[in-house]
Amino acid sequence: MILYRLTRSKYVESAWSGTGAKLYGGRWHNIGRPAVYVATSVSLAVLEVLVHVGDDELLTDFALLSIDIPENQIDILDIDTLPSDWNAPVPSTCTMEIGSEWFEVSHSIGLVVPSAIVPYENNVILNPMAKDFHKYINTVKRLDFGIDSRLVKAKK
């Protein structure tokens, strides 16, 4: 499964470490645990960044990264078990607990979760501490990438 990550170019070297997620947490895990959030399409990767960007200045110098993780290394979250507020603008502790529990019990590298922005599309949470994660770093490809500034203007 080819997965995509859009990151500031200055963070490319640490893009697969999970350090940012460890420091700040995320919708699907608690602070203190390394995690790497990726999307199943380039357009979703862009939207996942764009939702947090409010300034044309921030749209420069991005890198698009891809990684190839075998599907047998990826679990799928049963969305029918999610609470009604799973996609609230401010992540609920319930989704953080769901993801954190997966990190504790799973031996897989990734967990497919729905996007809170486009619920019919998926993100994947990668566990950089998983036993075999390092084997797939050599599949990473980089392409410099710019986001069309009209997308931010449309948000205003």
From Swiss-Prot:
One Pfam family recorded for the sequence: RES
Listed name of the protein: Toxin Res
Effect recorded for R27A: No longer toxic in E.coli, E.coli intracellular NAD(+) levels do not change
Protein keywords: NAD, Nucleotidyltransferase, Toxin-antitoxin system, Transferase
Gene name tied to this protein: res
EC numbers, comma separated: 2.4.2.-
Higher taxonomy: Bacteria, Pseudomonadati, Pseudomonadota, Gammaproteobacteria, Enterobacterales
Domain of life: Bacteria
Effect the entry attributes to changing E48A: No longer toxic in E.coli
Alphabetized GO MF terms: nucleotidyltransferase activity
Function of the protein: Toxic component of a type II toxin-antitoxin (TA) system. Expression in E.coli inhibits cell growth; bacteriostasis is neutralized by expression of cognate antitoxin Xre. Expression in E.coli leads to almost complete depletion of intracellular NAD(+): NAD(+) levels are partially restored when coexpressed with antitoxin Xre.
Self-association state and partner proteins as the record states: Homodimer. Forms a complex with cognate antitoxin Xre.
Xref: InterPro entries: RES_dom
Family: Belongs to the MbcT/ParT/Res family.
